[in-house]
Amino acid sequence: MVEELFLDKIKQEISERLPGESAHLRMSPEHRLLSSTALKNAQNIRESAVAIVLYRIENRIECILTQRPIYAGNHSGQVSFPGGKKDLSDENLEATARRECFEEIGIEREKGILLGKLTDVYIPVSGFLVKPFVFYHSELPELIPDKREVAEILRFSLFDLKKETLISYTEIKLDDGTIFRNIPYFNLANKKVWGATALILSEMKEILVNME
């Protein structure tokens, strides 16, 4: 009954009272434009999707993140949700999220109940327009990481997002030497989670707060 109540509430919040870009602001660096603003002048937009995988374990709900391997690229070593760009073979972007989740961490495509889609996030540095889909599993699914794409699978308690003590600020240095200061991040699974992933988590956090 508790599980059914949680699912009903979160689906209702996503479908009827999605916080939107206002929820992104808390975890946005000062220099970052809102996605809707940045999209006005964007070119060569690349459609993509991520999977927010929720599951029940014992008496709590957990969520999955992945850490990318170190490589020469804009997202080297970053913590993110399973996901990627849309393939021509994908029927839609939900299918993209399910496929990427299977390819990266081994969750079978047909598994997981779709709870809804959160607000799009545009990533100017890569041109990706990310659509975040929320999936729920009644138990921890079998996880098989693709070593080429995933250095580590991370798990955290979903309701920990409500703890203000998990938010801090750091300095980020990109591969090209650019340094960004006062970047907000979530400290989850002993990792600094910032950027687009933090924006998505910030909206999820507000959804959880609104469910009270």
Q: For the regions a protein language model found, what residue spans apply to each?
A:
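NUDIX/MutT-family hydrolases
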Residues: 145-174, 178-183, 187
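N-terminal leader/linker segments that precede catalytic domains of diphosphate-processing enzymes
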Residues: 1-80, 85-103, 107-115, 122-140, ...
